[in-house]
């Protein structure tokens, strides 16, 4: 009789990160719950770069500079975000810095999914905790719940996620 080892929080996060790096890019459709109610969007991630779109905003990040377009004002803001600011605009970025930036702890789940709670090691991140929920195989994230220090909560539910081919560099830059 062989028993499979119970996955640790770190192995669950590592498995998701490995799945996200197995192809040159990752494309996902998601729903954000919190704030102004449910908002659907798409994201394409390639390494540290990403492009995200919802009806309210569009965000491009080329690995250094982030452009955020707000549909309500028609204005674009340009920043060079910190790691914490990136995690707020792209919750998938949490998976790339979990080893050094968060303390990870495995949580139980009655639906057989794999859940990990991340608590920031630094005090000034703006986050109280983040809960990442993986599929039953632990390969892909299904949801990322962010709890902010000020009591706000945002839930990012991943409706569909898949590996993708290399993307043109212009996809990650505002033009």
What are these regions (language model features)?
Residues 19, 41-45, 58-59, 103-109:
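Short, exposed beta-strand/loop patches in secreted or surface proteins that constitute
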């Amino acid at each position: 009789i062989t028993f499979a080892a119970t996955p640790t929080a770190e192995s669950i996060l590592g498995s998701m990160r490995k799945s996200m790096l197995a192809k040159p890019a990752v494309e996902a459709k998601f729903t954000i719950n919190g704030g102004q109610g449910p908002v659907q969007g798409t994201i394409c991630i390639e390494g540290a770069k990403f492009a995200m779109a919802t009806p309210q905003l569009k965000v491009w990040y080329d690995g250094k500079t982030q452009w955020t377009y707000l549909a309500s004002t028609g204005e674009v803001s340009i920043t060079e975000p910190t790691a914490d600011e990136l995690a707020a605009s792209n919750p998938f970025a949490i998976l790339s810095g979990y080893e050094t930036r968060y303390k990870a702890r495995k949580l139980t789940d009655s639906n057989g999914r794999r859940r990990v709670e991340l608590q920031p090691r630094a005090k000034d991140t703006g986050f109280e905790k983040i809960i990442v929920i993986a599929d039953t195989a632990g390969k892909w994230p299904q949801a990322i719940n962010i709890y902010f220090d000020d009591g706000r909560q945002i839930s990012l539910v991943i409706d569909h996620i898949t590996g993708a081919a290399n993307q043109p560099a212009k996809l990650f830059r505002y033009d």
